[in-house]
Curated annotation (Swiss-Prot):
GO cellular component term of the entry, any: Golgi membrane
Bilayer-spanning residue ranges: 20-39
Side Cytoplasmic, residues: 1-19
Catalyzed reaction equations: alpha-D-glucosaminyl-[heparan sulfate](n) + 3'-phosphoadenylyl sulfate = 3-sulfo-alpha-D-glucosaminyl-[heparan sulfate](n) + adenosine 3',5'-bisphosphate + H(+)
Protein name: Heparan sulfate glucosamine 3-O-sulfotransferase 2
Binding site for 3'-phosphoadenylyl sulfate: 124-128, 205, 213, 330-334
Stretches assigned to the Lumenal side: 40-367
GO BP terms, alphabetized: circadian rhythm; glycosaminoglycan biosynthetic process; heparan sulfate proteoglycan biosynthetic process
GO molecular function: [heparan sulfate]-glucosamine 3-sulfotransferase activity
Source superkingdom: Eukaryota
Length: 367
């Protein structure tokens, strides 16, 4: 046997010692081979990273932490030929950004609803002021622009109309303003078909000063139009007023109101005095809040009188630097009108005003 041949060079070794030597030699050889293999793989990996950067994608749930530490790079984003990265498991996925969501990514509270209240008129009566004032109330959300749905855009449908509205909570009122509704023949029926419970707000003003204000606004946009006197009369010497001119026709409030009373009871229509809105804004807004069935949140503390513009403005909120006042287009200086023309128009409007007072049960004292 071999140990006898080897044993010639020295005394024989015990069997146990030979086994330990064999095991140690084998272990040392395996360790060397493994180390060489790992070094080789590491070198190949480094060369691949230097040649073409690649990123690990789509880690499994069990390996996310490990890959997060060893991930070689962050991709700039998928190319047109490259599929998007798969979404993370549902439990770890962030909430999707929805249309109309806030900056934090969570959906805005509330629902878009059809308006429960409308400011339907009248043009140049003070409707913008009422809208801006009532928007201060926490229980009212109002559309800032005039959608003209019931006069110009009715064919777009109620779903389109609803999509324009601000989101509201169950306890809030949705409101919009379009002054031309009051003189639109089809508007009362269309609003009734939307909801017979709709509350209507009408801001009225002395029809003569309203017509002059209307003309002043038009003149600022079209300086070449005829004079106010020329547009107001078909024959001034005979005192024949041209009721086809819209600035005159709008002020015939009793005539337009008849169309509304065919569909809505007087209790659902609230009339605001444009004159009192200037002299006592808190009082007029208090009555509007009562009509809408909401708390009297807007009071005297919310207003101050702007002497330059000649009407009240909202006091500045704590979060802003400047007071909230209507824009430059509001509070224009009216054009000078011949006093005789004003007297003729007052006489023309007198029977309409009296009938209007009797119908609504209020005396606006325009005579």
């Amino acid at each position: 046997m071999a140990y006898r041949v080897l044993g010639r060079a020295g005394p024989p070794q015990p069997r146990r010692a030979r086994r330990l030597l064999f095991a140690f030699t084998l272990s040392l050889s395996c360790t060397y081979l493994c180390y060489s293999f790992l070094c080789c793989c590491d070198g190949l990996g480094q060369s691949r990273l230097l040649g073409a950067p690649r990123c690990l994608r789509g880690p499994s749930a069990s390996g996310q932490k490990l890959l997060a530490k060893s991930r070689p790079c962050d991709p700039p984003g998928p190319t047109p030929s490259e599929p998007s990265a798969p979404s993370a498991p549902a439990a770890a996925a962030p909430a999707p950004r929805l249309s109309g969501s806030n900056h934090s990514g969570s959906p805005k509270p509330g629902t878009k609803r059809l308006p429960q209240a409308l400011i339907v008129g009248v043009k140049k009566g003070g409707t913008r002021a009422v809208l801006e004032f009532i928007r201060v109330h926490p229980d009212v959300r109002a559309l800032g622009t005039e959608p003209h749905f019931f006069d110009r855009n009715y064919g777009r449908g109620l779903d389109w109309y609803r999509s324009l509205m601000p989101r509201t909570l169950e306890t809030q009122i949705t409101l919009e303003k379009t002054p031309s509704y009051f003189v639109t023949q089809e508007a009362p029926r269309r609003i009734f078909n939307m909801s017979r419970d709709t509350k209507l707000i009408v801001v009225v003003r002395n029809p003569v000063t309203r017509a002059i204000s209307d003309y002043t606004q038009t003149l600022s946009k079209k300086p070449d139009i005829p004079t106010f006197e020329g547009l107001s009369f078909r024959n001034r010497s005979l005192g024949l007023v041209d009721v086809s001119w819209n600035a005159i026709r709008i002020g015939m409030y009793a005539l337009h109101l008849e169309s509304w009373l065919r569909y809505f009871p007087l209790a659902q229509i609230h009339f605001v005095s444009g004159e009192r809105l200037i002299t006592d804004p808190a009082g007029e807004m208090g009555r509007i809040q009562d009509f809408l069935g909401i708390k009297r949140f807007i009071t005297d503390k919310h207003f101050y009188f702007n002497k330059t513009k000649g009407f009240p403005c909202l006091k500045k909120p704590e979060s802003t630097l400047l007071p909230r006042c209507l824009g430059k287009s509001k509070g224009r200086t009216h054009v000078q009108i011949d006093p005789e023309v004003i007297d003729q128009l007052r006489e023309f409007y007198r029977p309409y005003n009296i009938k209007f007072y009797e119908t609504v049960g209020q005396d606006f004292r325009w005579e």
